[in-house]
Structure formats: C-alpha cells, structure tokens
Amino acid sequence: IDKYRKWDYKMPENFKSYLYISQLLQARGIKTAIEAHRRAKPFCMGTLYWQLNDCWPVTSWSSMDYYGRWKALQYYVKKLYSEVLVLPFVENKKLNIYIISDRLKNINGRLSLWLKDFDGTILWGYSSDVKIDANTSKPYFSIELEKLVGENDTCSIVLEAEVKEGKKLLSKNLFYFVKPKNLKLKKPLITFRHMKTEKGYR
C-alpha cells in the first residue's frame, strides 16, 4: 500500500488519514482500469473487479466492508459501470473526450465541458449536441492539451465533463492534469444544517 501511495499521495498525518488515503488510492487505481477496459470496447466487452465484499472483518481489496459499509471504491464503481460513461483521456498530447454507451439504441445527448479553477471560476467551456451511437466507445471531442491549459497552472485546475439526455444527467467525470499529491487544493469553508424529521435527520 505504501509503495503505491507514495506515487500519488502525500504522507498522511495519522493512521485515520492513512486508512482514508488507502481507500482513495484503491478507488483511483480500479477507476483507471475500468475506464481503460470500457474505452477499449469492442475489443474488451466487460470487466470484473476484485472484490465486492468480505466474509469477516479484515483489511482487504473489498469495496464494501464486512458490515456492508461502502468504501470509496464502491461509490466510484457505481458511476463507472453506468450504462453511459463520459471519459476524458490523454492521447498524443491531446485530450480526447470519449463517450461509452452500453445502450442498444442511439442517444440524442449533449456534451458539456468546463475547465475550472479550484474557486469554481470557469476558464474555458464547450457544449454541443451529440448523437451517441448505440453500444460503442468513441471520441466525440478532441483538443490539444497545450491549447486547453494555456497559461493556467495545471496544479490548480480541473476539467469537468458531463453528458445529458434532455435534462437527465447520464454521466459526469472529472479530469485532473496532475497527480493528487501535486494539486494545490485550498482549505474549504464548509457549513451545514441538519433538521430532525419523523424519519430521522436531513
């Protein structure tokens, strides 16, 4: 775990943080594999990951623990195995936006892309109607990385990609230009409210 963690993440401050980072590391690794397999359609028409759950309380590869609690990976694979997946992928110094569809009918959708900084400011945007071919994986947009990034600091930006069918969101994916340990994340100010209801809290 520590060997691979050093590739992508900084040293966690304590054991609790170490456990959390190890879950993110696992989720990111499996995400990379599943996206590659799905992008390779029709040469790869399916993929399984090891493993779904545990038969006793243990440190393992599972995406759910013995008690059925979801780890980071379980949240990732729920989105990764959606029937439509939008996928930013770098090839030959270009950022290509693939859309993978497992549906057996064509989709009239809309592809939207935004380059944002970590304050949420939109630095660049693109939107276009797309006819998503049934049961395929192919690129629907391409741009030179250098042109997209421009003068922006790659450690401080993210590309947000989404595909909609009408008002329904089919897929959303984020693309970072550097490893997580190199991101210049700002400490957020998070506020929340909760309210007691008959069914619990919301």
What annotation goes with each model-predicted range?
Residues 59-60, 126-128, 173:
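Short hydrophobic alpha-helix segments
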Residues 31, 80-82, 124, 184-189, ...:
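Residues that act as N-cap/strand-start positions at coil-to-secondary-structure junctions
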Residues 20-22, 64-65, 129-135, 148, ...:
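Short, contiguous acidic/charged loop-to-helix segments that flank catalytic cores in large enzymes
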Residues 170-201:
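Edge strands and adjacent loops of beta-rich recognition modules
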Residues 1-110, 114:
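Substrate-binding clefts and catalytic carboxylate motifs of secreted carbohydrate-active enzymes
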Residues 85-86, 102-106, 147-153, 191-194:
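Short linear motifs in intrinsically disordered
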